[in-house]
Amino acid sequence: METMDRYIRFDWAIKRLLRQKANFGVLEGLLTVLLNEEVKIVEILESESNQLTADDKFNRVDIKAKNSKGEIIIESETAEYCLSEELYYLERILYGVAKAITEHISLGERYYEVKKIYSVSILYFDIGRGEDYLYHGQNTFLGVHTGDQLLVTTKERDAIVTKLPAEVFPEYFLIRVNEFDKAAVTPLEEWIEYLKTGRIRPDTVAPGLVEARQKLIYYNMTAEERHAYDEHLNAIMIQNDVLSTAAEEGREEGRQEGREEGRQEGRQE
């Protein structure tokens, strides 16, 4: 790989570089291919934890963004090595969405001022079982006896319209980066490949990745920034080794317990 083709990993860039308005195009590209509609970022919201050290517990940035209709807010873009918090991750993102809903409506405002929330989580740990690398969750109300979807009546621009509850309730995207193991063909797949490997195809036309090739070049950082970045990568490698070792020790312990149970059953017979 040529030196100019080395790009900064997204989990690092999102905390240190992509908060700058000049770099919003990178984030907008990811959200555009994920939501399948144009997204324009209005501002980056400060997070509850902007820890910048190698032993970060969280790597979280809150993003306020509009779609092409100016209707939505992207509340949380989560890219993290959640090494000790993964057992309650769903509860954590639920809390984050609930907090965002209340933060973005003032006391005394009407219910129609409640904003649509999209929660996007980029996961570098194993959250559970599943065959896909991208999962999408949203609320639907199904008839218990009929199985039909409920349409609710509401008012928009002085007109009475019907809409699905999913258009109002939060939506969740879980990107399981480590589960992606195919050749990237679509813009979304190119993005997942970059999230996993840090590599960007030189001929990419994927929204956001074109900008990333210009703005996230490793050697554009200062020597001090490169040192901090390299330390970040080393910390990740060490943590991953610890996790792999612990997982293997757990499997070996399970195998030993199984063999011992087998011997005991044999003696009893």
Task: Report residues per predicted region.
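Elongated, amphipathic alpha-helical interaction scaffolds
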Residues: 1-269
